[in-house]
Amino acid sequence: IRFAANQVEEDCPQAERAGVNLNIYWAFAEGFIQRTAAALTQAEADTLGLSCFALACELATRFLDDYLLGDKYFKIKDSLHNLTRTRCQIALAQDMQRKMAAMNAIARDCWERYKTAE
């Protein structure tokens, strides 16, 4: 989600353009929950949006850490590449936070439709 549903590339210089595309998030949630409903608990479905937010924050931290430690882990295009990635992931996480109610509603709708289908 942090990659596929982001409205921009992960290294877009205009970080403020980063954000979650709810249509793509819906497609992901639909497919994921449909295939895992038999094993998925309601609590897990209810935290699907939060898990996407957490992953965006975690990756922002990893990009920033790599930048501060001299760009040893991630392949970079230039000396600010990981810093640019950090900013995009933070902007994505902020947008997810703003849209969390919608993300939760999407996951809940999918859960309700598929919890007994398996």
PLM regions and their residue ranges:
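ATP/Mg2+ or Mg2+-diphosphate-binding catalytic cores
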Residues: E58-E118
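Active-site activation/catalytic loop segments of kinase-like enzymes and analogous catalytic loops
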Residues: I1-A39, A54-F74
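All-alpha amphipathic helical-bundle segments outside canonical DNA-binding/catalytic cores
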Residues: L40-C52
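Short, structured coil/loop segments at alpha-helix boundaries
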Residues: A38-T41, N104
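Sparse, context-dependent recognition of short Cys/His-centered cofactor- or disulfide-binding micro-motifs
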Residues: I33, G49, D78-H81
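General structural signal for secondary-structure boundaries
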Residues: N21, T41-Q42, Q97-M100
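Short charge-dense sequence patches
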Residues: Q14-A15, E44, R113-T116
